[in-house]
């Protein structure tokens, strides 16, 4: 038997079958850095329409987790897809650098007794080191951005910009002084920063207190009962009896289940999970008569145990069901931050908040029962009073870890004190409030997914004033001078703030803390107090639309500070989206963004949150080291980001399987471009074979859909379209059909060059489609495509050379759609024949298609070449009426029956078709006549269609 391998055009490529991504990707990152890809992109798109995705800054503390990876990959896909569409799409990554977590890290390492300026220096140093670590991982993910020039909220220019933004809001009349609970030391007589608080053991009275139902009918209804047959009460647990006189609400978790427990003489409301432990503590027995979700208890009122007032139930996410508690929290808003925020969110004004504890720890004299008593000494009196009114369910002295002043080693409480706020309902000079402007901003914003609009609208509509001050050391200062007698701002406050901003721009925030007031106020200095508060870190990031986009990193956007897109996790409706909206509306009168895209949180394959204790944490660093960043990127693109995003080792393994399909398809395309030079060998669309025209037309249609999907941030659709194209239209049809023509026709024949031209157009388009997602692999593919290449696929735009079929083409879209349907039906019949051992494979088969007139007319157009489409050695067409006398099977296609028989002819050793003329040619009895003509010295085969 002769070896005909050398006469075939077998596939050959340098593109490897195995990705070996963990090994190859770091080299690609280095290549991008060496070529300064980000700047090359800026230069290539200069003068084009600008698209700005403004980066919400992650906190500069700790290693990145899978949520960070999801966020940065989604942003990178957006930016790269916009660049692919021809936009100038800058991406400036940022970091949030101030705040308590970094202060704590520095204190843990260096101790709490640092001088303030030394502590700030160490915080700055720590944040810088954390940024470098996170940046390394983000770059390794394949995220392209201005990594050499990111924005950092601790950069002097941004710290100064923040002060200028605050000045604008002061000028607009939005900033005022109000109340908020802070750490308070009676011995210091002042508020304490978190850094000035330490924890030590303290003996306390743990008490369970019953609040009698004031609305038994409403309580019965909440539990699905017609009425209550005995008195009812809700039970709270606390270790601070001294706060009971200031109680104003009761908090339950909206998602917890609460039980109504019959103890004989009294019905008790307790968290269902804690019923058994609570009854044991009370020395009672009881039965659960009904249950209800916490949300159904909202606004039902209960009577204060010893004062003539009621406390409503509010919903609060911070409520827990830890052992020893009841699942209900008593709320004294002046003495707990969570209590304060919950009551403010439910509309309680500052004036309505009870604040009977004075700065020295003594109740005001006008407090009934306990006026004039020091709170620690009042505790046993309060316990006795609760016992006397039959409201004390349990009393247990405990020793627990509690806040103490680091100077005096004495207990500290939360106490409402004066803080700085941004007012939501103060009218500006146009008679509009910030709340109204912000709600208008919500309405003017596009939300992806759409449900985000209602969520943010509700938050803005119901939120309290924004407390922007913190008693922190590591933060941007609130540079106010307040008159000692009147409490009023200095009349030149805005002017003075600009002076401070210039100093901060040169020296950083230390410029304010070191400042002697006389430098700015002269002889007036003695009349004014210098404010030492710092700004909430949400104000830091919430004003980046101003001090980054219009300050440190101007992005050339035609609409100033209004970004095209903010993209963050769903928690940012309450966070960055929220603070940015408020500052944007206060400063510029509109939202700082046109659209908000929200993604869900990552969970495991069972929908559980990730935690080290459960062992279900997926670390992006480990995924990159084991599978490669492109697998992580493909998983992100393939997942519906609008909800929870499930990830696990098994899910990533399935993602890797899809990746291999795309990679192998690309490899087949490249391998069959062996010997093809597009400048020399490309065939004009009108001269291509009909099947090749069809696949180019399909690619053109697909590209239009992919462009639309990218434009609308439907990355999962892009993934599905590409995967389906590779798996079905290419892998399941076109690539199978063209193998015979590609391998067996003469190397330079029109038939082969037509096919190669189609493959070339398809791979040129495909590599661009996947580049925003599979950036590493796309570069690898791009480098191997024949023809003139640029330096990076990421510098390219959508492939412009995909021709389309005429609407009235004889072999147009409808024609090939019918042919494809026939092929699928015939494939099923061939599979049945193989299973029945009628034939070994499709090329060993001859088929007769009994088709109705319409179908037969379609198939007749392909003539002799129909067998190449069906991958059989022979095809006969007959009328459907003739099927009755033949052993034909009904196919899955109406109007078609198929008869499959084993070919009686010998197999050609070169093309493997079974043909009647094999053995009849003296020149080579092992070959069919077609293969003889396709040998290099032969005249060549002519194909017209397939």
Curated annotation (Swiss-Prot):
The keyword Ligase applies. PROSITE patterns: AA_TRNA_LIGASE_I. One of its GO terms (molecular function) is isoleucine-tRNA ligase activity. CDD domains: Anticodon_Ia_Ile_BEm, IleRS_core. Coiled coil: none annotated. GO terms for cellular component: cytosol. This is Isoleucine--tRNA ligase. A motif ('KMSKS' region) lies at residues 609-613. ATP binds at residue 612. PANTHER family: ISOLEUCINE--TRNA LIGASE, MITOCHONDRIAL, SOLEUCYL-TRNA SYNTHETASE. It comes from Chromohalobacter salexigens (strain ATCC BAA-138 / DSM 3043 / CIP 106854 / NCIMB 13768 / 1H11). Its EC number is 6.1.1.5. The keyword Oxidoreductase does not apply. Zn(2+) binds at residues 908, 911, 928, 931. IleRS has two distinct active sites: one for aminoacylation and one for editing. The misactivated valine is translocated from the active site to the editing site, which sterically excludes the correctly activated isoleucine. The single editing site contains two valyl binding pockets, one specific for each substrate (Val-AMP or Val-tRNA(Ile)). InterPro entries: aa-tRNA-synth_I_CS, aa-tRNA-synth_Ia, Anticodon_Ile_BEm, Ile-tRNA-ligase, Ile-tRNA-ligase_type1, Ile-tRNA_ligase, M/V/L/I-tRNA-synth_anticd-bd, Rossmann-like_a/b/a_fold. Catalyzes the attachment of isoleucine to tRNA(Ile). As IleRS can inadvertently accommodate and process structurally similar amino acids such as valine, to avoid such errors it has two additional distinct tRNA(Ile)-dependent editing activities. One activity is designated as 'pretransfer' editing and involves the hydrolysis of activated Val-AMP. The other activity is designated 'posttransfer' editing and involves deacylation of mischarged Val-tRNA(Ile). GO terms for biological process: isoleucyl-tRNA aminoacylation. Monomer.
């Amino acid at each position: 038997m002769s070896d005909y391998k050398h006469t075939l055009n077998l596939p050959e490529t340098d593109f490897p079958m195995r990705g070996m991504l963990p090994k190859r990707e770091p080299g690609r990152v280095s290549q991008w850095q060496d070529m300064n890809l980000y700047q090359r992109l800026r230069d290539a798109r200069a003068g084009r329409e600008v698209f700005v995705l403004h980066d919400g800054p992650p906190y500069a503390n700790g290693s990145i987790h899978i949520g960070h990876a999801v966020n940065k990959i989604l942003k990178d896909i957006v930016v790269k897809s916009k660049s692919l569409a021809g936009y100038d799409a800058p991406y400036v990554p940022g970091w949030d650098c101030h705040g308590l977590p970094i202060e704590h890290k520095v204190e843990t390492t260096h101790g709490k007794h640092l001088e303030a300026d030394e502590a700030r220096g160490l915080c700055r140093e720590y944040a810088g080191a954390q940024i470098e670590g996170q940046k390394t991982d983000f770059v390794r993910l394949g995220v392209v951005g201005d990594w050499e020039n990111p924005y950092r909220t601790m950069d002097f220019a941004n710290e100064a910009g923040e002060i200028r933004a605050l000045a604008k809001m002061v000028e607009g009349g939005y900033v005022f002084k109000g109340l908020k609970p802070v750490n308070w030391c009676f011995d210091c007589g002042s508020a304490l920063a978190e850094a000035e608080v330490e924890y030590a053991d303290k003996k306390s009275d743990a008490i369970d207190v019953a609040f009698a139902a004031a609305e038994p009918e409403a309580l019965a209804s909440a539990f699905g009962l017609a009425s209550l047959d005995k008195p009812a009460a809700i039970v709270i647990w606390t270790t601070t009896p001294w706060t009971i006189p200031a109680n104003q609400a009761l908090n339950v978790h909206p998602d917890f289940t609460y039980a109504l427990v019959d103890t004989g003489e009294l019905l008790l409301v307790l968290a269902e999970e804690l019923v058994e432990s609570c009854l044991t503590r009370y020395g009672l027995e009881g039965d659960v008569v009904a249950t209800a979700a916490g949300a159904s208890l909202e606004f039902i009122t209960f009577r204060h145990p010893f004062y003539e007032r009621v406390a409503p139930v509010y919903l609060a996410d911070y409520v827990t069901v830890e052992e020893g508690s009841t699942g209900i929290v008593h709320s004294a808003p002046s003495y707990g931050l969570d209590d304060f925020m919950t009551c403010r969110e439910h509309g309680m004004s500052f004036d309505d908040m009870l604040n009977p504890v004075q700065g020295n720890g003594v109740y005001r004299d006008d407090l009934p029962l306990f006026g004039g008593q020091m709170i620690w000494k009042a505790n046993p009196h309060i316990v006795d009073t609760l016992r006397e009114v039959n409201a004390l369910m349990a009393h247990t002295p405990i020793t627990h870890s509690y806040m103490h002043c680091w100077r005096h080693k004495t207990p500290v409480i939360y106490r409402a004190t004066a803080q700085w706020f941004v007012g939501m309902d103060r009218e500006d000079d146009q008679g509009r409030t910030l709340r109204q402007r912000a709600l208008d901003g919500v309405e003017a914003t596009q939300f992806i997914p759409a449900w985000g609009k209602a969520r943010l609208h509700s938050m803005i509509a119901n939120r309290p004033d924004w407390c922007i001050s913190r008693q922190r050391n590591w933060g941007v200062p609130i540079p106010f001078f307040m008159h000692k007698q009147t409490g009023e701002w200095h009349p030149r406050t805005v002017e003075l703030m600009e002076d401070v901003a210039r100093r901060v721009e040169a020296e950083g925030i230390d410029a304010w803390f070191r400042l002697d007031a006389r430098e700015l106020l002269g002889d007036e200095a003695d009349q004014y107090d210098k404010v030492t508060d710092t700004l909430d870190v949400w104000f830091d990031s919430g004003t980046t639309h101003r001090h980054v986009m219009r300050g440190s990193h101007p992005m050339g956007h035609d609409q100033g500070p209004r970004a095209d897109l903010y993209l963050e996790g769903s928690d940012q409706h309450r966070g960055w989206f929220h603070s940015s909206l408020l500052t944007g509306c206060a400063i510029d009168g509109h939202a700082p963004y046109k659209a908000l895209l929200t993604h869900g949180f990552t969970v495991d394959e069972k929908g559980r949150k990730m935690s080290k204790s459960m062992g279900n944490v997926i670390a992006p660093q480990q995924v990159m080291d084991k599978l490669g960043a492109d697998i992580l990127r493909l998983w992100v693109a393939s997942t519906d980001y609008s909800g929870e995003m499930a990830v696990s080792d098994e899910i990533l393994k399935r993602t890797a399987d899809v990746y291999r399909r795309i990679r192998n398809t690309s490899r087949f395309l490249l391998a069959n471009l062996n010997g093809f030079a597009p400048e020399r060998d490309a065939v004009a669309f009108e001269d291509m074979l009909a099947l090749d025209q069809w696949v180019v037309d399909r690619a053109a249609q697909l590209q239009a859909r992919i462009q639309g999907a990218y434009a609308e941030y439907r990355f999962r659709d892009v993934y599905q379209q590409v995967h389906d194209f590779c798996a079905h239209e290419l892998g399941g049809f076109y690539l199978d059909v063209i193998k015979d023509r590609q391998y067996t026709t003469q190397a330079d024949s029109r038939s082969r060059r037509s096919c190669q031209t189609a493959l070339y157009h398809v791979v040129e388009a495909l590599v661009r489609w996947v580049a925003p997602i599979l950036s590493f692999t796309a570069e690898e593919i791009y480098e191997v495509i024949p023809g003139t290449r640029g330096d990076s696929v990421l510098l390219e735009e959508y492939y412009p050379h995909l021709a389309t079929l005429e609407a009235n083409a004889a072999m147009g879209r409808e024609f090939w759609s019918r042919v494809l349907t026939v092929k699928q039906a015939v494939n099923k019949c061939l599979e049945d024949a193989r299973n029945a051992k009628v034939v070994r494979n499709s090329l060993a088969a001859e088929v007769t298609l009994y088709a109705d007139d319409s179908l037969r007319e379609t198939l007749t157009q392909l003539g002799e070449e129909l067998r190449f489409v069906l991958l059989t050695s022979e095809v006969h067409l007959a009328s459907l009426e003739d099927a009755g006398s033949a052993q034909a099977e009904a196919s899955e296609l109406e109007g078609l029956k198929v008869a499959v028989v084993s070919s009686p002819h010998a197999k050609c050793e070169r093309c493997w078709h079974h043909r009647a003329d094999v053995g009849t040619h003296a020149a080579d009895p092992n070959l069919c006549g077609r293969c003889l003509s396709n040998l290099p010295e032969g005249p060549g085969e002519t194909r017209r269609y397939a």
